[in-house]
Amino acid sequence: TAEEDEAYSYTTTATDMDTGDTVTLTCTTVPSWLTCTAGALTGTPTNSDVGSHAVVITATDAAGATATDSFTIVVSNANDAPTVTSTAVTSATEDAVYTYTLTATDADVGDTLTFSGTTVPSWLTFTASTGVLTGTPTNDNVGTTGNAVVLTVTDAAGESVTDSFTITVANTNDAPSFSSTPVTTAQEDDVYTYTAVGTDM
């Protein structure tokens, strides 16, 4: 037996009843993830090697007589953490819709992945079922302050990976506005006064 991502080693030994006879060990059948040197097997199986692998090692004496050591190595699966495959969108523009879709894969066939928004700015909404992060930043969100994002992908075994990034929101020029209230009435022969006050975001 062997386990995915764990080093495997096995050394075949052979003897001959004929005193002083030389025995040569040859690897006849060996899976690709193993290296065989004079009957010594070493290697580390990966996720793609999970399953059964036949091995045949042949012992040959000086007279050409042979014997075989045949067995099967069963590589058991070890859970692999998910991998984020999407590239985060790290820039946004004030008053424009921002969208980023998180995607991920897992080397374990059939593994179920769950998305969650661990840290999400107030102007954004993360939908776990689709992996979509979207929202529209305002003038208050310009820059990077408060725009850190951490999204988490978790597999069925509880292994997780995070997609962490900061969004930089670019400013869009805002038109000025009046903050004063006009005086809309006046009295004959009385001085009329109104001071207009304007602001800009």
Features from the language model and the residues they span:
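Single, function-defining residue in the core of a domain
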Residues: Y8
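Short edge beta-strand/loop segments characteristic of extracellular beta-sandwich folds
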Residues: T11-T15, T101-T105, T195-T199
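Acidic, turn/loop-rich segments in luminal/extracellular domains of secretory-pathway
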Residues: A2-E4, D18, T22, T29-A78, ...
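Proline-enriched interdomain boundary motifs that mark the N-terminal boundary
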Residues: N79-T87, N173-T181
